[in-house]
Amino acid sequence: MATTFSLPPLPYAYDALEPVICKQIMEIHHQKHHQTYITNLNAALSAQSTALAANNIPQLINLQQKIKFNGGGHINHSLFWKNLAPHASPETNIDQAAPVLKAAIEAQYGSVEKFKEAFGATLLGLQGSGWGWLVANGPGGKLEIVSTKDQDPVTDKVPVFGVDMWEHAYYLQYFNNKASYVEGIWKVLNWRTAEDRFKNGVEGSALLKL
């Protein structure tokens, strides 16, 4: 029997990220979009189990893209919710919440502001749908800004934090003004979660836990 996944609860209320991300976006994004990825992932895994039992290799191959896309959507969104925290909460203060990560950012990018500029340029440079990520390259902790297409997840590095650049993440509130969404996301970024992921990655003990 195939493993099934369920929608994780948000670690805050749907209106907790206002005014940066409105309640309506959070409700639709979590209850509809994320749930759809999980529903489709479970269906694909069930079909995979059936195909495996029948030794149906062509069907197993056909299901790979569905599992990758919907599984990636589940991974990415599960990480994204934990990347966020209510505006002006202690978690959004990098000095208090992420001193180790802040020092690494400053050492590599010169300053937090220069890093934000570089990260923002990557987000706004995405064509179509995708994600922007700050990742750590395992032990040693070298930081890197990367983007992934559609729902491709980060699997070969430690995802410190990511930002959803699909239109469903911002369009109801920001319309086509992606720059304002990107500017606002820093106000609700959970630096404490980012710090934990970064430190675990440096120590070589990071596991992708949803």
From Swiss-Prot:
Its main location: mitochondrion. It is an enzyme of class 1 (oxidoreductase). Keywords: Antioxidant, Manganese, Metal-binding, Mitochondrion, Oxidoreductase, Transit peptide. Its cofactor is Mn(2+). Mn(2+) binds at H29, H77, D164, H168. Belongs to the iron/manganese superoxide dismutase family. This is Superoxide dismutase [Mn], mitochondrial.
